[in-house]
Amino acid sequence: MNQLTNLSPADLSAQHEQDAKDLTRILPASTKVYIQGSRPDIQVPMRQIALTDTPTGLGGEKNPPVMVYDTSGVYTDPEVAIDLNKGLPHVRQAWIEERQDTDVLDTLSSSFGQERLKDIRTADIRFAHIQKPRRAKTGQNVTQMHYAKKGMITPEMEYIAIRENQRQRDEVDMRQHAGQNFGAKNLTEITPEFVRQEVAAGRAIIPANINHPEIEPMIIGRNFLVKINANIGNSALGSSIDEEVSKMTWATRWGADTIMDLSTGKNIHETREWIIRNSPVPIGTVPIYQALEKVDGVAEDLTWEIFKDTLIEQAEQGVDYFTIHAGVLLRYVPLTANRLTGIVSRGGSIMAQWCLAHHEENFLYTHFDEICEIMKAYDVSFSLGDGLRPGCIQDANDEAQFGELRTLGELTHRAWEHDVQVMIEGPGHVPMHMIKENMDLQLEVCKEAPFYTLGPLTTDIAPGYDHITSAIGAAMIGWYGTAMLCYVTPKEHLGLPNKKDVKDGIITYKIAAHAADLAKGHPGAQVRDNALSKARFEFRWDDQFNLSLDPDTARSMHDETLPKEAHKSAHFCSMCGPKFCSMKITQNVRNYAQNQETAKDFNPSTEEVEQGLKSMKQAYHDNGQKLYQKV
């Protein structure tokens, strides 16, 4: 595949146009709508799914459109001209500027960033419209947590409140089960003030670097909708800049709330710039990966100075959250010796190797307060990495894993002293009966800071299907209180995922996250389920497809056996056929009941009941003793 920057503007336009056509095909009956907040520049995007009317024979009524959360950015707005060479509109630029607490720098602060900018070998692959970076003014703190603690409701917080409510209205079916929330808060409406309170308390984060004005603000916390993250990134074995940008736009179209760029191959700096400039969602990274590349992959040669420069480099590009493995302490490393699979985290193994080589404490831990100073100058959130997570179910919940978790709790408090936002990463591989212990301990030692887990995988026997083995654990831990789920693709443990794998992983994790919202009893979570169930009962096939997470797949599976357009209005599917459709039979029962006298007006005697039963028995035999009759 060609490098993205080798494509002409016309090629890029044609590529986007084709992508847009594909999206219209796979998300039919959907319209991009914007809900305005208290000011004209707060325009919150949502996807509105139009529904057809209920057939006259089934009651005949209008079905209101269903509003759903949308992460696709302006890529799905037909009114916006997309130019990947220029990047996305700067949604937050005015909000950042009006706070008057940042400076625009003359040039990049990091040594490596300056080197790449001057390197003529990167000229052909470099993003052409790099803006000068921002940094907090001396003595200022620009984090959303700092604003929240001061009592400020920022435009980002108002935006999020509107977005979380999904504009659910009285005319949609709001019935739902109460759920069990394990101590979480279920409000009937999310307000900007509630968002502020949750961020101030550390129970939620708004990952929003001041150098990433393109993002549409979102929130991660257990009292909000469960979010999902998608991992992308190149490796030494392959992938190009255009492939990674394409994966990012593809992932956000299917519902990824955040993206992690885990690139470890060539041109990491340039790849990340292209992704950030074109991403409507927060971008996370693992800075130690790039720092390791700077020392040619020799972990022992890592230094605090190299890592610090990498943090500043990425913060000035606009990375919204960093995974930092500061909890991998020297004393925990020997605890992994008897594990079946040892240390499986790349970041964890890098820091463990450094600690053993120098027999010194992890420099990410000893320099943690200095890291906080960098984070609060750009509003980069911590994603405190679980470098000692279990890599198989045999190693689940051991002393090394939980020792690190307690250290992450300590570091959370230290970050909060700087008003830096924090979420905590979790496992991993954990059998079902041991999952809740992880959630309970995390809530206790990290004081309800958002939990962000990779699955967990509930069994190790299904390579090629680990998106399923992990989604089981993800749904459970999401119900218990995890705020964001890191997706797993079918390629997990096997290879670098392609676009199809990315889609499969996201759809699987959207199911897990939504199931968790239902189980928690999150207000409005059941609206889409109710609408789809009603469409199914009324044989509105197109509405069923359009309301599903993957309309294209649902429609194609239906059409494999019933391809004709007339089948879209048929009162049966190929599973049961026309005679044995339970939905159709139930409709017949309803019609029969409506034509009979009500119990209020009809009180038959015992003799009348017996006579009625005899009559129905005779009718059954007269009709050939068939359970279902032709209608």
From Swiss-Prot:
BP-aspect Gene Ontology terms: thiamine biosynthetic process; thiamine diphosphate biosynthetic process
Cofactor(s) required, per the database record: [4Fe-4S] cluster
Catalytic activity entry: 5-amino-1-(5-phospho-beta-D-ribosyl)imidazole + S-adenosyl-L-methionine = 4-amino-2-methyl-5-(phosphooxymethyl)pyrimidine + CO + 5'-deoxyadenosine + formate + L-methionine + 3 H(+)
Protein name: Phosphomethylpyrimidine synthase
Pathway connected to this protein: Cofactor biosynthesis; thiamine diphosphate biosynthesis
Organism: Acinetobacter baylyi (strain ATCC 33305 / BD413 / ADP1)
Keywords noted in UniProt: 4Fe-4S, Iron, Iron-sulfur, Lyase, Metal-binding, S-adenosyl-L-methionine, Thiamine biosynthesis, Zinc
Gene Ontology cellular component annotations, sorted alphabetically: cytosol
InterPro entries, A to Z: ThiC, ThiC-associated_dom, ThiC/Bza_core_dom, ThiC/BzaA/B
Binding site for [4Fe-4S] cluster: C573, C576, C581
Domain of life: Bacteria
Pfam families, per database record: ThiC-associated, ThiC_Rad_SAM
Gene: thiC
Its job: Catalyzes the synthesis of the hydroxymethylpyrimidine phosphate (HMP-P) moiety of thiamine from aminoimidazole ribotide (AIR) in a radical S-adenosyl-L-methionine (SAM)-dependent reaction.
Binding-site positions, Zn(2+): H429, H493
Cleaved signal peptide residues: none
